[in-house]
Amino acid sequence: SGANYYYLDSDGVMARSQWIDDTYYVGSSGARASNRWVWAGEDSDAPSSDGGWFYLDANGRMVTDTWRVINDHRYHFDSDGRMSYGWLTDEDGSLYYLGDENDGAARTGWLCLDYDGEYGQEDGEVAAVLSGGGTWFYFQENGRAIRAAGENTYANRTINGYRYYFDENGAMATGWVSVGNREANDATGISTLEYFGGADEGQMARGWRYLYDDPEDTDDEDFSFGPATSSDASHGGWAHDYEGGDGAWYYFDNNGTPAYLSTAAQSLSGATTRVDGHRYFFDEYGRMKSGLLGFVRADGTVVSAYFGADDSDGAM
């Protein structure tokens, strides 16, 4: 009848509000649905007994087992035609987040979710969307989350001029994290760490940063500090003390590596770091030190140097 199609059973009775051959749907008027969403409850005659949202294309056929752009949003449909939602890992291993059961649109850009990260993401699991204080993910224009290829590795991406790192589950790195798989060149392992700010920051630190987050308190389960032995006179080192609990100045190069006291330091120049024409001393945990400090040579003699009156200075 015109542009509409109707289904008649063997007795000539027109079908209404039901699925036909698990492929088409006719509405209350009996007309075949096209270019529209259809909701079906559980235990209905829908192609999936779980119910959910289904989409009928321009020819009235239910969309199945594919991605489809609808009204400028990207949706995924399973083999039964049911719209996917929540977390989704597709056949090629790409990770997406599709909102709740009444949404389904693949997210793009930054998204903060209530996610503990202990067991990864289950397909169909819905996470609460937060304004902050949760776990941040970044989804590309095609909806794919940026994430590392394997466990205990990180993928990095420059976004709006800042470098971010993401683990195998797509979670943005925060705090002190070992992301580069570098060999340590110091007494504690600080040379393998970078700093990525608080829970709602994530930018890799460069230049000077005053931090209350101590690197010894890293949440990186795959990292542990070694004992600090650089003050041993037989190795050469600095005579100084540190009281925990306070903040400290750190300096990070363009690759995010903090300045630190190298175990190879055997001289005043080797034990300090030049920044903007001045020399500074950073201890085995990367903390800048100030005041009068003594460098202990391998032969036990001490060379003293003055590094400013307080922590706001530190220049030799």
Per-region residue spans from a language model:
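Extracellular adhesion/carbohydrate-binding repeat motifs centered on closely spaced tryptophans
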Residues: S1-M316
